[in-house]
């Protein structure tokens, strides 16, 4: 089955708008198991139960709360959540560009492919080629299913990839961990030991070929499952409808020049106000 886009919209940088489609770059390969009652093989159903009364709680009586100070809660209303939620928009807005070498891979979270839609090829190619030539990455904001993410935009093979980024605040500080210090003398490591370790690394050095590696656990489980399957079931998953997108032809040269002029004005204004 051909892949379907998550949404159709646009990617913007400066005043340039490029109509694109966003596709998941990673397929679902995780094995999901259902829980059954071994006595009659019926599905196990979870209920929303009140801890004190043991009674099931209807959805209209459930509220969301943030726990603080061990057992104390602040009720968060749905209208408050809606106000905090970002405006739903089918666009990727590049806010700045950074040298690609400065973006540490630990920030990468989830990849998506960007594909140009009709009349968007020229702007798409301009963005792809300028990212290659300048060896830069676009830092952008993107909203997916009502949640805003930080993302990196960079060329990948023949196309452009968007990789969601983790925020710096998500990382634990290494100070919290009992890690060895940078002073190797403290651990009495000899030059010979380092040399032998280096030889081992060089002996194991090879080219990175991702297609060589497979999820062996999944393969074993699926082989075992398929051996037991006598009948199969199919599941239909509803996909989000694609939003209409403008495909008007634009003058990219003029937009690029005007974007540069706008940035220069902003910089002059900032330096003059100091």
Curated annotation (Swiss-Prot):
Keywords: DNA damage, DNA recombination, DNA repair, DNA-binding
Keyword Zinc attached: no
Alphabetical list of SUPFAM superfamilies matching this protein: SPOC domain-like
Cross-referenced Gene3D superfamilies: 2.40.290.10
One BP term from GO: DNA recombination
Limits of the Ku domain: 11-195
Molecular function per GO: double-stranded DNA binding
InterPro entries: Ku70/Ku80_beta-barrel_dom (IPR006164), Prok_Ku (IPR009187), SPOC-like_C_dom_sf (IPR016194)
Keyword DNA repair: yes
Described function: With LigD forms a non-homologous end joining (NHEJ) DNA repair enzyme, which repairs dsDNA breaks with reduced fidelity. Binds linear dsDNA with 5'- and 3'- overhangs but not closed circular dsDNA nor ssDNA. Recruits and stimulates the ligase activity of LigD.
UniProt record similarity statement: Belongs to the prokaryotic Ku family.
Assembly mode: Homodimer. Interacts with LigD.
Protein name: Non-homologous end joining protein Ku
Gene behind this protein: ku
């Amino acid at each position: 089955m051909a892949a379907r886009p998550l949404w159709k919209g646009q990617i913007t940088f400066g005043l340039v708008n490029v109509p694109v489609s966003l596709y998941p770059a990673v397929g679902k390969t995780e094995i999901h198991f259902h829980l059954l009652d071994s006595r009659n093989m019926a599905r196990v159903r979870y209920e929303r139960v009140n801890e004190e009364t043991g009674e099931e709680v209807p959805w209209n009586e459930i509220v969301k709360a943030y726990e603080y100070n061990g057992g104390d809660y602040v009720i968060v209303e749905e209208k408050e959540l809606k106000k905090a939620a970002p405006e739903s928009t089918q666009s990727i807005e590049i806010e700045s560009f950074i040298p690609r070498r400065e973006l540490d891979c630990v920030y990468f979270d989830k990849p998506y492919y960007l594909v140009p839609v009709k009349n968007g090829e020229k702007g798409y190619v301009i963005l792809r080629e300028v990212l290659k030539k300048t060896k830069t990455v676009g830092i952008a904001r993107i909203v997916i299913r009502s949640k805003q993410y930080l993302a990196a935009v960079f060329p990948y093979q023949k196309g452009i990839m968007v990789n969601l980024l983790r925020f710096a605040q998500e990382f634990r500080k290494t100070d919290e961990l009992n890690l060895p210090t940078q002073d190797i003398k403290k651990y009495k490591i000899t030059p010979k030991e380092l040399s032998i370790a280096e030889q081992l690394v060089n002996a194991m050095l090879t080219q990175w070929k991702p297609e060589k590696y497979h999820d062996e656990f999944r393969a074993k489980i699926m082989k075992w499952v398929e051996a037991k399957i006598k009948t199969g079931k199919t599941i239909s998953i509803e996909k989000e409808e694609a939003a209409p997108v403008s495909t008007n032809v634009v003058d990219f040269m003029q937009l690029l020049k005007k974007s540069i002029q706008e940035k220069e004005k902003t910089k002059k204004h900032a330096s003059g106000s100091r």
